[in-house]
Amino acid sequence: MGITVRNLQKRFGDFTALDNVSLDFPPGELVALLGPSGCGKTTLLRVIAGLEHADAGQVVLQGLDVASVGARDRQVGFVFQHYALFRHMTVFENVAFGLRVKPRRERPSEAAIREKVHELLKLVQLDWLAQRYPSELSGGQRQRIALARALAVEPKVLLLDEPFGALDAKVRKELRGWLRRLHDDLHISTIFVTHDQEEALEVADRIVVLNRGHVEQVGSPQDVYDHPQSAFVYEFLGAANRLPGTVAGRGFVAEGAAAPTEVD
């Protein structure tokens, strides 16, 4: 499913979280929303999901403006940063939850639910944990169960809010590769939020760099890294040598000192 947002505005009191944001997310891509805390990336994700309402602008899913469509009916799967698994339910029951709360006319049979849950647990390689409770799982296992639960309702779009932020570095790196392989198998439109530059560069097809509610740059990981379009982007993506100055003719003036430097 393709996603388009147009001229999104969102304020919380005096704070502007999204300031006239317009983006296109082609079907089947894995896109990273990258930026520092407070840049608007999670707010954008929640507006797309229908968990927040924009003050102005449009969210279009598969050609339909969903401003009046509730989160439940947007065919979106959402994975929260801290998993939000039900502690009193087993792994199996957590994954089955979305299917069991569907309206009666849309709800699969119990046999179909069991088959679907076991299929998803095999997909995330945790079918052997079906009868355990969340408290008996590692952080990485909980995250994969949360993802299986989101996939159970067969969403057209998958949204992930800092999915690996609460994990240690080794597990985070392993799950990044796993998510990339899973996406390549499923080809579901996926948007994930991260403040980890390495994570975005390694996993995403495209990166959207956000800063103070504005889109700074959109491009492939290589384009964004090799050709930053603003001082913020190159400073945020890693250590860089910055030489302030101006191009004058075919020369360069740095810190007020002219040098006969040729510029192509």
Curated annotation (Swiss-Prot):
PROSITE patterns: ABC_TRANSPORTER_1, ABC_TRANSPORTER_2. It is an enzyme of class 7 (translocase). Keywords: ATP-binding, Cell inner membrane, Cell membrane, Membrane, Nucleotide-binding, Sulfate transport, Translocase, Transport. Its main location: membrane. It is a peripheral membrane protein. The keyword Translocase applies. Part of the ABC transporter complex CysAWTP involved in sulfate/thiosulfate import. Responsible for energy coupling to the transport system. This is Sulfate/thiosulfate import ATP-binding protein CysA. It comes from Burkholderia cepacia (Pseudomonas cepacia). The gene is cysA.
